[in-house]
Curated annotation (Swiss-Prot):
Assembly, per entry: Homodimer.
UniProt keyword terms in alphabetical order: Calcium, Glycoprotein, Lectin, Manganese
Protein name stated in the entry: Anti-H(O) lectin 3
InterPro entries: ConA-like_dom_sf
Entry PTM: Highly glycosylated.
Family according to the record: Belongs to the leguminous lectin family.
GO MF, one example: carbohydrate binding
Entry keyword Glycoprotein: yes
Keyword Secreted: no
Function: Binds lactose or galactose.
Length: 35
């Protein structure tokens, strides 16, 4: 679910992007899909 995707995104994305997307789980999910 979102926590899993957020964790994976954190592993592949720089900390700056992680902090940006971390504000909203839905935004984080969309960011992963767009990448």
């Amino acid at each position: 679910s979102s926590d899993y995707l957020s964790f994976k995104f954190d592993k592949f994305a720089p900390n700056q992007l992680n902090m940006y997307f971390q504000g909203d789980a839905s935004v984080s999910t969309k960011g992963v899909l767009q990448l």
